[in-house]
């Protein structure tokens, strides 16, 4: 039996189980991020675990045809798979539910007609199927979004719970011992290559073989592209494949449609990007003025960067495209921390992924950055809401004098708090803005291996 690796969503599933007003749960996310494994592990909390996989159990699809009687459906499933389905004792798991649109439509009726039964559904590319459904139970179904493993989960997989606890005690000017800091930096470098796909992480913990991980990552990418072909009646699979791969070449950069492909119009690439976003494969980081909350009130979707769902998969795409340079690998493995942060678009992307994944998983999260209008190249990598205030976050390593964009933004928006995220140790400093009536502003240095602390401090 495959070893299960602790996931952040485990606690969300337990909370859902104990909620007396729970709704059927729809677990959403890209293929192979660990949805099924998380539910199967969670199933140990129940006396019985009744699993239906619509890719393998095609006959069960017929149970959902015609008039929907969910109690009768549950009885039929119980008889077919020979597992008791009893309210309060059984977890009913409907996996790969995108293969049975009728089952998606039936989820709402479990809330209305069989609310005492614990029901979880999961699937990949669900949004492609949901687009064709008139409704799938808004208000009667609870969604959770799942992603590849965060850096903290990666540390758990490597049995470094003690290292996490030590790190969590450091903050501001309370820096880590250099030995622990160096160890976390090395783990972060490894994470950039191994990524967070559970199969790749598990392979790394067993073999410490980067090539084994890369083979797994390439297989996952090819599986994604095979999935696109299943929806060729709705969208051109080559367009999705071209857009997905083209995005990877612009990691950490402002997205330019023309650089993705000259064979497709911008409107076609924009639609492919929308579908890849819905499928959880990419996440746009949209430019915003940063004048107030909410950040999307003044967002400009014509200016965006794009986060690919996993750093390891990103490098696998570049490998498949013949564009993964040895220089980039050497930068990740052996470049100085300053070079890795300031020159590596992958590092900026991972920082965005980390910040997104530590937010509540009950909705698809939006990400924002700031760029000054006009000819200036001033830019803030990310804008976050921290303690109900707009907080600029720079992914850079350097001295105070190298923070021109950060200083400009804080002065323009009259902000007093900011974060600089790099591979430096924990720290902080104040500076006096001589161009703004000697206003005192505070910058916290947060290591990239500690972005999970951003929301808790």
Kindly give the residue locations of the regions a language model identified.
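Domain-level recognition of nuclease-like catalytic cores that cleave nucleotide substrates
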Residues: 426-457
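Interdomain motor-coupling "hinge/lid" segment immediately C-terminal to the ATP-binding subdomain
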Residues: 131-249
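N-terminal pre-Walker A segment at the start of P-loop NTPase domains
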Residues: 1-16
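Hydrophobic positions on the alpha1 helix immediately C-terminal to the Walker A/P-loop
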Residues: 38, 42
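Conserved catalytic cores of phosphodiester-cleaving nucleases, focusing on short active-site segments
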Residues: 351, 355, 380-399, 418
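Conserved lysine of the Walker
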Residues: 35
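Accessory nucleic acid-recognition modules appended to NTPase machines
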Residues: 201-378, 384
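Short glycine-rich substrate-engagement loop in P-loop NTPases that contacts/grips substrate
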Residues: 56-88
């Amino acid at each position: 039996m495959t070893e299960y690796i602790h996931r952040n969503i485990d606690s969300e599933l337990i909370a859902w189980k104990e909620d007396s007003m729970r709704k059927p749960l729809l677990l959403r996310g890209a293929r192979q991020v660990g949805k099924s494994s998380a539910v199967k592990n969670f199933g140990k909390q129940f006396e019985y675990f009744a699993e239906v996989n619509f890719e393998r159990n095609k006959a069960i699809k017929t149970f959902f045809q015609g008039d929907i009687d969910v109690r009768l459906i549950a009885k039929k499933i119980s008889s077919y798979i020979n597992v008791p389905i009893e309210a309060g004792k059984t977890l009913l798991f409907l996996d790969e539910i995108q293969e049975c649109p009728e089952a998606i439509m039936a989820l709402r009726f479990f809330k209305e007609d069989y609310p005492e039964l614990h029901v979880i559904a999961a699937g990949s590319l669900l949004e492609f199927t949901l687009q064709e459904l008139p409704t799938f139970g808004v208000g009667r179904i609870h969604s959770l979004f799942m992603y590849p493993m965060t850096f903290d989960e990666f540390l758990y997989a490597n049995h470094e719970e003690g290292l996490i606890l030590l790190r969590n005690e450091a903050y501001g000017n309370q820096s880590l011992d250099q030995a622990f800091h160096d160890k976390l930096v090395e783990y972060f470098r490894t994470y950039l290559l191994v990524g967070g796909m559970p199969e790749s992480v598990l392979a790394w913990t067993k073999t410490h073989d980067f090539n084994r991980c890369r083979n797994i990552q390439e297989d996952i990418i090819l599986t994604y592209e095979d999935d696109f072909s299943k929806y060729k009646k709705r969208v051109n699979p080559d367009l999705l494949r071209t857009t997905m791969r083209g995005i990877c070449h612009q990691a950490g950069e402002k997205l330019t449609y023309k650089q993705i492909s000259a064979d497709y119009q911008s409107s076609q690439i924009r639609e492919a990007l929308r579908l890849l976003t819905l499928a959880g494969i990419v996440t746009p980081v949209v430019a915003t003025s940063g004048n107030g909350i909410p950040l999307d009130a003044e967002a400009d979707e014509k200016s965006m960067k794009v986060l690919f769902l996993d750093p390891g998969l990103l490098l696998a795409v570049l490998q498949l495209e013949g564009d993964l340079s040895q220089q980039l690998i050497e930068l990740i493995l052996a470049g100085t921390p300053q070079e890795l942060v300031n020159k590596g678009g992958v590092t900026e992307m991972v920082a965005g992924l980390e910040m997104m994944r530590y937010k509540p998983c009950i909705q698809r999260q939006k990400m924002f950055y700031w760029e000054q209008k006009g000819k200036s190249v001033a830019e803030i990598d990310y804008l976050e809401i921290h303690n109900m205030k707009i907080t600029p976050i720079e992914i850079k390593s350097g001295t105070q004098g190298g923070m021109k964009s950060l200083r400009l933004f804080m002065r323009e928006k009259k902000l007093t708090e900011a974060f600089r995220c790099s591979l430096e140790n924990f720290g902080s400093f104040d500076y006096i803005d001589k161009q703004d009536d000697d206003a005192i502003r505070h910058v916290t240095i947060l290591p990239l291996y500690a972005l999970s602390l951003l929301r808790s401090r």
